[in-house]
UniProtKB/Swiss-Prot annotation:
One of its GO terms (cellular component) is ribonucleoprotein complex. It comes from Methanococcus maripaludis (strain C5 / ATCC BAA-1333). Zn(2+) binds at C31, C34, C49, C52. This is Small ribosomal subunit protein eS31. GO terms for biological process: translation. It comes from the Archaea. A zinc finger (C4-type) spans 31-52. Pfam families: Ribosomal_S27. Part of the 30S ribosomal subunit. InterPro entries: Ribosomal_eS31, Ribosomal_eS31_arc, Ribosomal_zn-bd. Belongs to the eukaryotic ribosomal protein eS31 family. Its cofactor is Zn(2+).
Amino acid sequence: MAAKKGVKTSTKKSDYYKVEGNTVERLKKACPKCGAGVFMAEHLNRFACGKCGYLEYKKNEKTETEE
């Protein structure tokens, strides 16, 4: 018999917003394909959407040459 799968815990969506007075600021980037309700995961060199698989690579901000 196969082992039973555990219950997945949902993420706490309130951690993705910052409220100051009457303004709300999103702390994570939203997916351009899925819309404003789906946030993208931030990795070392890219942003990824877990719902549709959209990838956006970060730009290298290294403009100076290392000596």
